[in-house]
């Protein structure tokens, strides 16, 4: 298992350590940023608009796939409002034929290749996905 303190993240990285691990793992799995996926993709106005949100990863390869890294504390222990936002984001994307897969940060720290590969195969092992 990797701990956040063991990961060297570039100073200009704007996301979380688990998001960086996922980013690097998707690259190791043969996906190219800017071509196969976009990192931090705002939809429906992003966080600045009511009902908008930001996807951690929006993929073109494979098509119609989005992946969000879920911080266990914020997304599960912070209350029902955070969970409701995640469920609404998933439903909104489903209406656009995009599958939103969640990867829990604690799972990502244990085995990034497994969980990222599973996400690329549209398999959700997160607490929200029933995993």
Residue spans for each PLM region:
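Nucleic-acid endo/exonuclease domains
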Residues: 1-131
């Amino acid at each position: 298992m990797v701990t956040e303190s063991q990961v060297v993240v570039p100073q200009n990285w704007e996301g979380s350590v688990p998001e960086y691990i996922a980013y690097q793992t998707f690259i190791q799995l043969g996906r190219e940023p800017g071509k196969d996926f976009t990192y931090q993709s705002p939809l429906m106005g992003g966080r600045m608009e009511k009902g908008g949100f930001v996807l951690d990863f929006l993929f073109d390869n494979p098509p119609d796939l989005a992946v969000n890294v879920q911080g266990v504390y914020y997304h599960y222990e912070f209350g029902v409002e955070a969970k409701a936002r995640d469920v609404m984001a998933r439903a909104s994307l489903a209406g656009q034929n995009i599958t939103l897969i969640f990867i829990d940060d604690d799972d990502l720290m244990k085995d990034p290749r497994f969980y990222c590969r599973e996400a690329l195969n549209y398999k959700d092992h997160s607490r929200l996905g029933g995993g």
